[in-house]
Design a protein with these regions (language model features):
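General beta-strand structural signal in soluble alpha/beta enzymes
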Residues: 2-5, 26-29, 60, 86, ...
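General structural feature for long, well-ordered alpha-helical segments within catalytic domains
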Residues: 10-14, 18, 22, 34, ...
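Rossmann-fold NAD(P)-binding glycine/threonine-rich loop
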Residues: 133-167
Length: 167
């Protein structure tokens, strides 16, 4: 069964219940399809930039189903848990932050960063699954040398390729 266009947290609940009740594969494209393609792109970009997956720092902007699935797959592929910072519309998802639901709280880490601008400094990878224009040229400049930027917001990206090229 291929699930499509079901928002979090409903998608997690529906997928889990279907997997419990059915003896056939269940695939939520928004989560798993996005994660598979993004990991493939990351592996390619790391090869080109000569960076190692075990050493990179990633900032994931967005905390929906696709962001969580990408984060899980990145971790399962060798990115250290402490090297992934997830940011939602209220800021960094950190341990001790109030009002995190059970799904978001699973991605909370120990960090002093509270904003995207703080978290992005020195990052090797930006994965945007959020909103148009959220990543600025100033933020790109603050990233590591040869940063990897996946601006995947739909329909308009977090930053345009033209803006990145100006940096």
């Amino acid at each position: 069964i291929n699930l499509e266009d079901i928002a979090a947290p409903d998608c997690f609940i529906i997928e889990e219940k279907l997997k419990e009740k059915l003896d056939i594969p269940v695939f939520h494209d928004d989560q798993h399809g996005t994660a598979i393609i993004t990991l493939a792109a990351l592996i390619n970009a790391l090869d080109i930039s000569k960076k190692l997956i075990k050493d990179i720092k990633i900032v994931v902007n967005g905390a929906g189903a696709s962001a969580m699935a990408c984060t899980n797959l990145f971790k399962n592929s060798g990115v250290k848990n402490e090297n992934i910072i997830m940011v939602d519309r209220k800021g960094v998802i950190y341990r001790g932050r109030d009002n995190l639901n059970q799904w978001k709280s699973a991605y909370a880490i120990e960090t002093k960063h509270r904003t995207l601008e703080e978290a992005i400094k020195g990052a090797d990878v930006f994965l945007g699954l959020s909103a148009k224009g959220i990543l600025t040229k100033k933020m790109v400049k603050s990233m590591s040398k040869n940063p990897i930027i996946f601006a995947c917001a739909n329909p308009d990206p977090e930053i345009t390729p033209e803006e990145v090229n100006e940096v």
